Amino acid sequence: MQIKGRTVALFLLVVGFVLSCGSHSPNNRSDHSDARTDFTLDILGGSSIRFVAFGDTRFHDPSDTTPANASVRQAIVAAIDKERPTFVSISGDIVFDGDDASDWKVWDSESAAWREHHIPVFPVLGNHDLKGDHDTALANYFARFPRVEKNRFYSVRFGNCVLLVLDSSQDEVSGEQGEWLLRHLDLYANSLDFIFIALHHPPYTSSLDEKRYGGGHSARTREQSLARVLESRQPQMHARLIVFSGHVHNYEHHDHGGVTYFVTGGGGAHPYLIPRKPSDLYQDSGINYHYLMVDATPQRVRVTMNKLDIADGKQQWTQPDVVVIPGAAPVARQPISNRTFTQFSSELITRKYETDHAHSYRRRRAANGRPLETRLEGGGLPG
């Protein structure tokens, strides 16, 4: 009887332990937790990829012209739709108030054509996207972008490249996000040709905090630390590092330590004028509403700045800056196997998505009848 009693007690102890663990499992997390896991989406099917990078759209009531110029924003969104890019990377401040449902409804309406044409959007969290009630803002954000599965930072594999998306409301080079970033830089350093990094706050900018230029922001210490990490690693890497940021409502292009930096905050938010330095690689000190078209091949990346001016209701598009970034000198590249993909995750889920020639996410057969593959990497869904 004593042995039986001990067996029952041991059984109850094990059950209690399992239940307590289950209460903290990924599937039971709150929708608004700050927990995060790794996430990788593979877009296979071609060595040449075309995508758009831009930000600071501030979707909001078009009749309120203080936060943004709605006609500019709408024109840029329409122009991007006509381009039919593989995907769009938005570097934050998608809406004006993250917890305002009406702002997100403006996003729903004005970006509807992208969803109609199956253009995926890979977002970055900006300070305005988190404005107001934190939980409500995150819920609104994740509801619009289910593909990222509630991850605040994540990676997107495509062709010979990867896009690493960071949350600059948290430290980029320390803590969980910092460990994740360094791990991925190591993973892809010599196996891919280009590593793109997208975040909201810029590591480099000639903008100032002074408001005499209509507003602006200088670079923060946190992003300067990120730049030092990237530039210290670049000489030892085969992959070239390219960084897209926003927050400053203008366009900038900087090269430091072998890393190319773009500020692409000209998506419609009220513009900041920048007192350009002589060393700045782009010198137009005026208003620069724009989006960037990025063409990536194994040999080079071409970034074209598409600038919009509207006068008397007429749109004028120009391309005042075109940047060609060559691939690194040939070195012994290390192919990434499925084992390498899974070494930092608890599971590998493979899904089949059949796409059209633009690599969009329609579930239909490609011309050759073979589906493209989407691969998700992660150990459970973060809240």
Which residue ranges define each predicted feature?
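Extended active-site neighborhood of metal-dependent phosphoesterases/phosphodiesterases
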Residues: 27-39, 43, 64, 101-195, ...
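Active-site glycine-centered loops adjacent to acidic/histidine catalytic or metal-binding residues
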Residues: 56, 92-93, 126-127, 200, ...
